[in-house]
Amino acid sequence: MDENVLVKNLLPCVKEAGSKIIDIYNSKPNAEQKYDGSPVTIADKAAEKIIIKKIKSLCPSIPIVSEENPESHNLKSLSEFFLVDPLDGTKEFLKFDGKGSFTVNIALIRENEPLIGIVYAPAIKRLFYAGKTFGSFEENKDGIKKIRIRKSDKNKILAVASSSHLDQKTKDWLVKNNIARTVSIGSSLKFCLVASGEADVYPRFGPTME
């Protein structure tokens, strides 16, 4: 399936998953603990169900590696697969602070390279999507616009940092590079702020899950 067509077919289900997450968010659910000790809620599971069903209907032959399905993590040597995190930023989700820095994420990976990527922050209604062949876009209340990274002024560099993984190595790097301006935010929104030209760099030295 053409990448652009695939993204257009996936966007409605991403929004549906986001709506389900917000419905559950408003009820302030309790968290359970995953196999790795990290939190998981019924919102993670409900969003995953919506996304997996849609992907299987569109591309039944392509395997799906999902954050909430540990068995899928054992799939090895895949040349092509969907990578899904139905609720990235569960810790931010569970703060119920109204900031909304949690996201729904889908990517299609082929030969270790992303072909498409979708990130949706339902609480603030910002939707980002990109494809290797058609560029990067944001959809929000004002419509759809093409996005791009910005040209950095070395004296005004803005770093975006993790709200839950800001370690000493990152702090030292910021000092070493004379970066005094930072914004702290959770989830994959950090990448989106760089991609849309709202920030310049996202330093990450800690472990990163696939």
Q: What feature does the model see in each segment?
A:
Residues 130-131, 144-152:
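Short amphipathic beta-strand/extended segments with alternating polar/hydrophobic composition
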Residues 149-210:
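An extended, acidic
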Residues 45-46, 98, 164:
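Short, surface-exposed acidic/glycine-rich loop or hinge patches that mediate macromolecular interfaces
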Residues 76-137:
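DPxDG-like acidic metal-binding loop motif
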Residues 140-142:
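Solvent-exposed strand-loop boundary residues in beta-sheet-rich modules
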Residues 1-87, 110, 168, 172-175, ...:
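N-terminal subdomain of lithium-sensitive/metallo-dependent phosphomonoesterases centered on the IMPase/IPPase/PAP
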